[in-house]
Amino acid sequence: MEKSFTCDALSRELIFNGLKGDIIDYVISSYKVNVKLIYLYFYHPNLQVHCHEVLEGTSTGKETFIYEHKDKFQKGGKYHAKFILITTTEVCRFIVMTTNITNITIQNCLNDYYVITVPKCGLKAPNVFTTRLYQFLDAYSIRLKSCLNQYDWYGLEANLLVSIPQGINHSMCWRMLMNTNKKVQGSAVIRTSSLALGWDIKKILRIQQCTVEYAKDYTKRPELQDLILYNFDNNLDKKTNKNKYDLRSVEMKPFHYKRYTIEYTKPNKRWLIITSANLGKSAWGTLKWPSLNAELGITWNSKFNFN
């Protein structure tokens, strides 16, 4: 039986019931991504999920992933990055999430992720974008296990350097991936940890024709109604029974949980973006208490109703 959720109800189910198995068998460590979660929200008849160290098997019981990291503990630093490639007969989605990849490379990235959608174009020779993608993965010792040349990487949206926090420079690794100075057609959803209340997401994402929907403010403060509002589901400090973070100054605080949706009018697409960032040493969680960072970019899915 299909379930329908509001945005708020969905996030509560994901966060609070995931461990109980009510919706998903939700277990994740620093190195593993749950395939069931991806299958649930990226549903497509010909969906394939290629993950770094898949935790659960696919729907057929067979693990499918195209890359793996050679050295998880390079020079004493845990490998924290999640690279996920999702392919269907129509598009390829390359999702990158970085948090302290090693002790020596872009360790100040905080909690950025990038969702890149690439249309399928049939078999073609490698172009500049496939070359950069391979260079990017090679830079992080990601060993490819299949070919990506059948996707039209030339049509990739190139504007990825968006709202990087002042004093943090991790753009060099992305310049290998694509030329950010050239405007091309395509789609990309970019989320960085520096987005703050009151910022114009449409302008930041450089989306011309779209509407942006925001989650309701749990505190119901009327003065925040016109701002970009985030939900802080775990905002209550049990010791003091007070909120940990003040929403009015959230841009100066560690982001704990945020969610918003972006709806495109041309082409007709909709994204539900869920992320969390507890920037302490347990940001990525444990097997018993998983990190919420597994909810990356979720494509709009007619199977579910996120009204």
Enumerate the language-model features and the residues they cover.
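PLD/PLD-like phosphodiesterase catalytic module centered on the HKD motif
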Residues: 1-307
